[in-house]
Amino acid sequence: KSQIFSTYADNQPGVHIQVFEGERAMTKDCHLLGTFDLSAIPPAPRGVPQIEVTFDLDANGILNVSAEEKGTGKRNHITITNDKGRLSKDEIERMVNDASKYEQADKMQRDALEAKNGLENYAYSMKNTVSDTNVSGKLEESDRSALNLAIDTALEWLNSNQEASKEEYEHRQKELESTCNPIMTKMYQSMGGGAGGMPGGMPDMSGMGGGQGPAAGASSGPKVEEVD
């Protein structure tokens, strides 16, 4: 099984991979199996590097987890054996029971996290777009100021509201989109664009969905969490 992750900050030099075992939505409620780092990632804007994390569980129960930065081919991995910190049968049964017991609460947490990631991804994507000289130079000064103010306001709110509800994050994203979409559409139309989407490099104006943020979603296998 493979999954693509990315960086969380501009020019992030590496990622810290944490491998968890468990059925819960959040890694804090799961069992940490091991960690490893993937370093020397070339400087790039947040979300640009493509890091493929692959899980391989063999017939003997030995788990191999590898991470590869697709642009450079830089790789690292960890091997986790049955005798290295794995849960016992009783512990696994308890965690499965807990997952069933807290299923509704976990779903609310997971939905809120996905909405938070959606807002964060959209805001940073718009920030990168407005910072692009190819775009910035085509915006009217008043529009550029309005975009920067709306983006900065959304990011400041995010920093102060890390545990808001799904509805609050979705409301904030709609507010941001209500400022960004008309301005970007007007700019595109002034360049002679028609239907069929925005120019390359511009974010989807319909809003971005929940991204591959840390611990996004529950799964039946180990989880990967990235940090700065």
From Swiss-Prot:
MF (Gene Ontology): ATP binding; ATP-dependent protein folding chaperone
Region (Disordered): 191-228
Biased composition regions of type Gly residues, renumbered to the chain: 191-200
Annotated Gene3D superfamilies: 1.20.1270.10, Substrate Binding Domain Of DNAk, Chain A, domain 1
SUPFAM superfamilies given in the database record: Heat shock protein 70kD (HSP70), C-terminal subdomain, Heat shock protein 70kD (HSP70), peptide-binding domain
Keywords assigned by UniProt, alphabetized: ATP-binding, Nucleotide-binding, Stress response
Family: Belongs to the heat shock protein 70 family.
PANTHER family: HEAT SHOCK PROTEIN 70KDA
Name of this protein: Heat shock 70 kDa protein
